[in-house]
Regions:
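Nucleic acid-binding interface residues in structured DNA/RNA-binding domains
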Residues: 16-21, 29-33, 37-152
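Polybasic, lysine-enriched low-complexity intrinsically disordered terminal tails
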Residues: 1-27
Length: 152
């Protein structure tokens, strides 16, 4: 079974309409920045350089994760930090921005776009994570689409 948008298991009802805030949040143009921490923050020590990325940076990253592969959030954060010459990537904005990417992609799926044509957020959001539980796609949909991408 293909985990298409209409076959979501426990997915929440979607209102992919013009009123959805996610495409607008995705479209906001902001620059990434690297800041120096003047106190410990979210497990990152004072004096460390911290990347505050953007939704687009996360969307670009997830688009590069190959079909059938997944990445843990920690790996995503570490790779983005290295790429932007920082010690770490902000864990708080990582969750916020990955949710924006996921919900904007979900709106596209709901409007008929093929999974192959959206940012494949399911490859970096673990179905058992707290973030997954907030998504309209639902945790079962994430499990189903991940399973569908695995070789048989």
């Amino acid at each position: 079974m293909s985990p298409r948008a209409g076959k979501r298991g426990n997915a929440r009802k979607s209102s992919a309409s013009a009123a959805s805030p996610w495409p607008a949040k995705m479209a906001q143009k902001k620059d990434a920045k690297v800041v120096m921490l003047d106190s410990d923050f979210a497990g990152i020590k004072k004096g460390a350089s911290l990347l505050v990325a953007t939704p687009e940076i996360f969307a670009d990253y997830v688009r590069k994760v190959p079909f059938g592969e997944t990445r843990r959030i920690e790996r995503v954060r570490n790779e983005l930090a290295r790429k932007h010459k920082a010690d770490a990537t902000c864990p708080v904005t990582t969750s916020i921005f990955l949710r924006i990417v996921a919900e904007a992609a979900w709106d596209e799926i709901q409007s008929g776009k093929a999974l192959a044509d959206v940012a494949p957020f399911w490859r970096v959001i673990d179905p058992d994570s707290p973030l997954a539980k907030k998504l309209r796609a639902g945790t079962q949909w994430l499990r189903d689409v991940r399973a569908a991408e695995q070789p048989t």
